Amino acid sequence: MVTLKPTKRDFIFDRFFEKKNNYEYFYYEEDPTVENDIELFGYSKFTCDASYEDGEVQWNYIIKDHRILGITAVKNDGDNLKIKFLEINSKLRGRGFGAETIEYFKALKDNKKYKAILLYPKDEEVAEHFYKPLGFKENGGELIY
């Protein structure tokens, strides 16, 4: 099962978005046993800043067996848990780590008694092939579980 380790948004931005090509590998500094194995493609600092102006967002590393698999950002929005960002290392996709992360959030929803998990997928293909098979339903422009 994956776990989440909180981190600071600025640390992620410094590591990913300020690099010229965004191909930087690094280790989880608070736990030196975590390997250098995460990368993030296709996002600019501007895009992420614009996406998260609506309040406090908790950034987390997605970790399994001391390996950073990806990053996620979530927001406690009263009765709902909003997944603002979920990205698995492109070299590790298709192995179920994203689905494990969603299962983690489903368990969190049940334990915290959130009414729903909300998210806004990058595109319709991601919604159809990833989130909907995991139980998410369309609700206007968002997906809800």
Question: What residue ranges belong to the model's regions?
Answer:
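Acyl-donor-binding surface of acyltransferase catalytic domains
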Residues: 1-12, 137, 142-145
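Acetyl-CoA-dependent GNAT
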Residues: 7-84, 89
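Conserved acetyl-CoA-binding loop-helix of GNAT-fold acetyltransferases
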Residues: 88, 94-107, 133
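A general structural motif
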Residues: 112-116
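Conserved beta-strand-loop-alpha-helix junction that forms the acyl-donor binding cleft
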Residues: 118-132, 137, 144-145
